[in-house]
Structures are given as structure tokens and as C-alpha cells.
Amino acid sequence: SYYCSCNQEGDDEYYCASEEIIKYYLDPRNFLTEITIFQFLDLSNNEDISVSKIENLVKGTFLDGEANGMRYAQMIYDASKASGESAYSLVIKIFQELGKNEKENMPHVVSGNDEKYPNVYNFYNYGAKDGENNIELALEYAKNAGWTTPYTAIVEGAKLLSSSYLNQGQ
């Protein structure tokens, strides 16, 4: 048994991990599936990721297009440079939060067409919570942050993501 010596009396739910199990979970070769391998993805900016590679990743989604004369892929590329976060990681985060809707179905929180919050964008769903008014909360957050263009929302949101996660040693 690997009972932890730091456990309090009566706290028998936690056990120390064996060296063998730690080695297993730290070895990416044990997780070579199309889903589990991504837990080892380096989230920091990779200079080899070009705008064209980002274009391929977002092809057919709501990010396959442009706003204010700039392609979303270019915005994500710029956000990666400004934040130090991998462009792939940023795209994955946006898809995780908003889905991959087809090009014609822009998620409401990034459409800029909300009656109460016109020209406000939140690509990372900051401020949203589970419940009925999650979109309103996300748009309120974006309004207070000054995210009034898609470019600003993508770049500044990436900086926030990086400062609260990647740059904290996570």
C-alpha cells in the first residue's frame, strides 16, 4: 500500500502514487491515441505554425473567413505571437468554447449583432457561466474588457489565457 504519510488520521481515501505509476503517466508513448496524446501538447508558441497551417485547421468552420478585412487565421497567428500561446492551442480553445459551426453559422457571442451588446466579441467565452444567461455574461465581460472588434477579442483574449494559465507554469 502507498498510504501517504502526510494524510490526516481517518483520511484513508488518498494514497501516494508508486514510482512505476508515475513513470507510466508521464510517458506519452502510453497515450498514443488521437484524443489522449493532446495532454502532452506544448501550449507555447511554435514558430513553425504558419497562417496557412492555421487556415487548414479552421477550414469549413466559422473561423474560415474574415472580419474587417483580415482573415481569422491571421488574427489567431497574431494572437499567438502576442501571447506566447500556440496558435493550435488557441484554435482548439475557441472550438472548445464555441463549437466548430459551419462558416455560415457564426456563434452569437462572436457575431457582433447582439441588440444589447452590439459590436462586442468574446471568442473564448470569458465570463460565461452555466445557465440561461451565459451569452449575456460573456458579452458583458467582453464589453467591459473593450473587445469591440474580432481582432481585439482574439488577441487580448489570448493574452489573458496565456497570463492566467501558460505563464503560470501550467
Q: Where in this protein do the model-derived segments appear?
A:
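Short, surface-exposed glycine/acidic/tryptophan-bearing loops
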Residues: 50-51, 108-129
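Short, functionally critical alpha-helical segments immediately adjacent to catalytic or ligand/cofactor-binding
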Residues: 76-102
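Extracellular protease catalytic domains of secreted zymogens
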Residues: 114, 132-143, 153-156, 160
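Extracytoplasmic/periplasmic, Sec-exported soluble proteins
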Residues: 67-72, 81-85, 115-118, 141-153, ...
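Cell-wall glycan-active module
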Residues: 1-83, 159, 165-170
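Substrate-binding clefts and substrate-entry loops adjacent to catalytic sites
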Residues: 58-66, 70, 119-148
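Non-transmembrane alpha-helical segments in soluble domains
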Residues: 91-94, 158, 162
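Solvent-exposed loop/turn segments at secondary-structure junctions
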Residues: 96-101, 126-133, 164
